[in-house]
């Protein structure tokens, strides 16, 4: 699906979508338990993949209405699925479900689309093997299809922290229902650490204890997933909020602003986007009690940013840098190359196609703002929702019309993205 966006000015109120990261974890936590109601979940292609996995393990998922799902879980004992589990394009589903599947007595096979089958899972599979489960890649390259199972009981394991924090999340969530629990030693610096903070925060809401140790984490075994009052409320998604904030900062009307609802504080590292835009000269006001962000247009100046703990913000920051004056230098971004696509290369290529001056290095992306004016053209979404949404924001400030391919991929995390842009006044034409 192509979407065409013309240079536009925006203003008005819009509600942030629920957090994808919290929704994935809440669904799986409810599956590990007896039952739970999830309030304000994100219903998207990725989170529906996690719901189907819960059902494959013997749980049930009922959509009560658009704001509630009720999950009956499998009480820490997933059954062996009767068929493969198709995780589609969701790396989070694959990794979290791989550790869950390793608790089953039999074997589970996980696969997904072409993009997912290129993503690395080797360290998690090796950890499962160390814990006396079965974890292997059918191609023996650490990539899906994956085979997991043999009911691992817990123990001690060492794992790198600089490839994906989802490995740690997967082991913590599964470890709570093992016999022995799991002690995790980090072999490297933990990148994307706020995502593990999200996990620890959510597990606490489900009455599951995690201990931070000198060299990693420990989760005692034999625990039960029991949320307070049987419910869990999903907060707004700051990864998605970043695009709405950027839209206001670069394209709000002279007498207006973009106001974003549902932006309550949480453990999300991507809430750093507020401070980043402020550092670039943006005037972002955050009413934390009301959960509202207000951002008018501003003249932005390039800054230097380390995205080691907020990889999903790289496309947004790169777009802001292309519109700002001066250089925006994005450091510590090698791990951002291992997402749905190589996001470092994709943003360098597509912003370059729009006329931006960009320098790409292995662990760094520099956007030389102010050297050229962005111009509308045909750009590729690279099958990646975050690339698509970031390019859409660039299109708001570009001369002429920009057409973005693969635009249907916003369904992964922000299904109503283009409707939200239109509601704010952007010129959006969807070609289905």
UniProtKB/Swiss-Prot annotation:
The active site is at 312 (proton acceptor). The keyword Nucleotidyltransferase does not apply. GO terms for molecular function: 3-phosphoshikimate 1-carboxyvinyltransferase activity. Pathway: Metabolic intermediate biosynthesis; chorismate biosynthesis. SUPFAM superfamilies: EPT/RTPC-like (SSF55205). GO terms for cellular component: cytoplasm. The keyword Cytoplasm applies. Phosphoenolpyruvate binds at residues 20, 91, 119, 166, 343, 386. It catalyses: 3-phosphoshikimate + phosphoenolpyruvate = 5-O-(1-carboxyvinyl)-3-phosphoshikimate + phosphate. Pfam families: EPSP_synthase (PF00275). Its EC number is 2.5.1.19. GO terms for biological process: amino acid biosynthetic process; aromatic amino acid family biosynthetic process; chorismate biosynthetic process. It is found in: Cytoplasm. Keywords: Amino-acid biosynthesis, Aromatic amino acid biosynthesis, Cytoplasm, Transferase. 3-phosphoshikimate binds at residues 20-21, 25, 164-166, 192, 312, 339. Its main location: cytoplasm. CDD domains: EPSP_synthase. Catalyzes the transfer of the enolpyruvyl moiety of phosphoenolpyruvate (PEP) to the 5-hydroxyl of shikimate-3-phosphate (S3P) to produce enolpyruvyl shikimate-3-phosphate and inorganic phosphate. Monomer. Belongs to the EPSP synthase family. This is 3-phosphoshikimate 1-carboxyvinyltransferase. It comes from Haloquadratum walsbyi (strain DSM 16790 / HBSQ001). The gene is aroA.
């Amino acid at each position: 699906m192509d979407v065409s966006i013309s240079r536009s000015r925006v203003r008005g109120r819009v509600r942030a979508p629920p957090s994808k990261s919290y929704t994935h974890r809440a669904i799986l936590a409810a599956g590990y338990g007896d039952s739970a109601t999830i309030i304000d979940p994100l219903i998207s292609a990725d989170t529906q993949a996690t719901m189907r996995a819960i059902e494959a393990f013997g749980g049930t998922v009922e959509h009560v209405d658009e704001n509630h799902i009720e999950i009956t879980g499998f009480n820490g004992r997933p059954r062996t699925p009767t068929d493969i589990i198709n995780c589609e394009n969701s790396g989070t589903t694959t990794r979290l479900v791989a550790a869950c599947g390793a608790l089953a007595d039999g074997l589970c096979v996980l696969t997904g689309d072409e993009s997912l089958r290129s993503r690395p899972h080797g360290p998690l599979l090796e950890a499962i093997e160390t814990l006396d489960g079965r974890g292997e890649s059918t191609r023996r390259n650490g990539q899906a299809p994956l085979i997991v199972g043999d009911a691992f009981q817990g123990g001690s394991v060492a794992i790198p922290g600089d490839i994906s924090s989802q490995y740690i999340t997967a082991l913590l969530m599964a470890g709570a229902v093992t016999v022995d629990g799991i002690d995790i030693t980090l072999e490297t610096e933990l990148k994307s650490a706020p995502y593990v903070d999200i996990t620890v925060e959510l597990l606490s809401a489900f009455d599951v204890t995690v201990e931070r140790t000198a060299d990693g984490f420990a989760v005692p075994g034999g625990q039960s997933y029991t949320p307070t009052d049987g419910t869990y409320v999903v907060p707004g998604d700051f990864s998605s909020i970043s695009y709405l904030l950027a839209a206001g900062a670069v394209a709000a009307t002279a007498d207006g602003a973009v106001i974003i609802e549902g932006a309550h504080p949480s453990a999300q590292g991507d809430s750093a986007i507020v401070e980043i835009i402020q550092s670039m000269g943006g005037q972002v006001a955050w009413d934390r009690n009301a959960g509202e962000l207000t951002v008018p247009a501003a003249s932005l100046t390039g800054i230097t940013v380390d995205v080691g703990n907020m990889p999903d913000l790289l496309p947004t920051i790169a777009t802001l840098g292309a519109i700002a004056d001066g250089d925006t230098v994005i450091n510590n971004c090698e791990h951002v190359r291992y997402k749905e696509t190589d996001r470092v290369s994709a943003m360098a290529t597509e912003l370059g196609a729009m006329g931006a001056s960009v320098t790409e290095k292995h662990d760094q992306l520099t956007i030389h703002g102010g050297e050229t004016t962005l111009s509308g053209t045909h750009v590729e979404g690279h099958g990646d929702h975050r690339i698509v949404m970031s390019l859409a924001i660039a299109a708001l400030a570009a001369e002429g019309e920009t057409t973005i391919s693969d635009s249907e991929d916003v369904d992964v995390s922000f299904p109503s993205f283009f409707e939200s842009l239109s509601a704010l006044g952007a010129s959006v034409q969807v070609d289905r």
